[in-house]
Amino acid sequence: MKSPMILVSSGRTMGSLSMQRQQSALYGMCLALSGGTGVLSSGGDARTLAARCDGLLLAGGGDIHPSRFGQPVQSEKLSIDPVRDEEEQALFQAFFSRGKPILGICRGIQAVNVFLGGTLRQHIEGHSDCCHRVRCIPRLAALAGAAPMVNSYHHQAVDIIASSLHAAAWAEDGTVEALLHETAPLLGVQWHPERMVPPLCDDAAGANHLPLFRWLCERC
């Protein structure tokens, strides 16, 4: 059986070049362990890419420009890449319109929410470079556990949830940590599961979030 091809979308605001390579390698290994093949996006026509690939992974990275959700810039801590915003919105629409599965990670969950009409909190405290527990609904608990320990590397967060999405996990302070679509194969998580797959990487001791990548590959 042919391995599903998963397009991994990333940008230029993920940090140093070495960090970008490490992050891309982790996504690739997690997808390979899940039966898929990761293909790093390097631009191109979104509709053509969606026709060639079986699924989309919206990777972590910088912040989404507030103009995308109808707000002025309110935080000096934003790291914005408008070109990436535009490219990923085109990719999202191309894959989503074809009913192909999409997994959003960190920035990716925020992008999914914005692209479907939701909004973001531009800056929150206490969610950068730490680990904490989240409470998951049963549908997500089947993949991640009911109250898993997760990592946290973000300062933007989901605010108003798009009407076609619903919250699937929350941090103890009420921050939305996961979103699921009502009908489409679309899942977003605020944490970085690629860093929680022992022995590749283990930010949260004992956690293994490879099933999230299997979810993506199995729906192709």
Name each model feature, range by range.
Residues 1-105, 115, 121, 125-149, ...:
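N-terminal beta1-alpha1 cap of cysteine-dependent amidohydrolase-like domains
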Residues 169:
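Conserved catalytic core of two-component histidine kinases
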Residues 109-111:
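Hydrophobic, aromatic-enriched interface-forming segments
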